[in-house]
Amino acid sequence: DATFVPYSIFRDVQRGSSLPWHKDYTRPALLDFFLPARDSHAAAYYDWGTEKETQWKENYRLWMAFVNEYKNRGGRVTAGADSGYMYNLYGFGYIQELELLREAGFHPMEVIQSATLNAAEAIGMNDLIGTIEVGKLADMILMDQNPLKNLKYLYGTGDIKLNETNEVVRVGGVNYTIKDGIIYDARQLLEDVKKIVDEEKEATPNWESLMIQSIDR
């Protein structure tokens, strides 16, 4: 489990703190927790700049090369996000991790395998989950786009592109999640999260300043 995503913000703090989903899906309390702090390991970017980001980019180059070579030599790599700090948001952070595996040199199918079969094998449950086969649990996601073409389609908010009439449209996103035989409307679940965040915003008068502090650093 390479878990690239938690420290990836150190490569570009301004970008990581202003990712588009934070406005709608990150609770104010979590935004406050994400702000720079001298006494917090999870918010150590209180004096950050180009030199440190350049060092971290080189660190990631070496780290990714190692993980990719480990995979190429037969090592099993799984995907994990360790979300909850440094602007690494639950759900969204996991898809960021898949994109980082792709950046490391994994083929898109190897990325998907890291998140499915490899993970199931690592915990000794590949007889029940990890692949779609007769007799296995039907734990899966359903979507109308191909993530092998663009892993960003796996984000709850999908991705944007120009359509045939030159209009900007949003495509992708998971439509349904099936877990333990229960079908969940993934888009409705995401809307439920937004409502929870909106309710906390109403009870947090300074939430906009937290968002501004996240972006204007």
Where are these regions (language model features)?
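Solvent-exposed loop/turn segments at secondary-structure junctions
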Residues: 5-9, 83-86, 118-119, 147-148, ...
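Short, positively charged
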Residues: 48-49, 109-110, 155-156
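C-terminal or late-domain output modules
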Residues: 111, 127-130, 139-144, 153, ...
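Extended hydrophobic/aromatic segments used for targeting, binding, or gating
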Residues: 79, 85-142, 171
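Active-site neighborhoods of metal-dependent hydrolases
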Residues: 1-104, 197-217
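C-terminal cap of metal-dependent C-N hydrolases
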Residues: 137-194
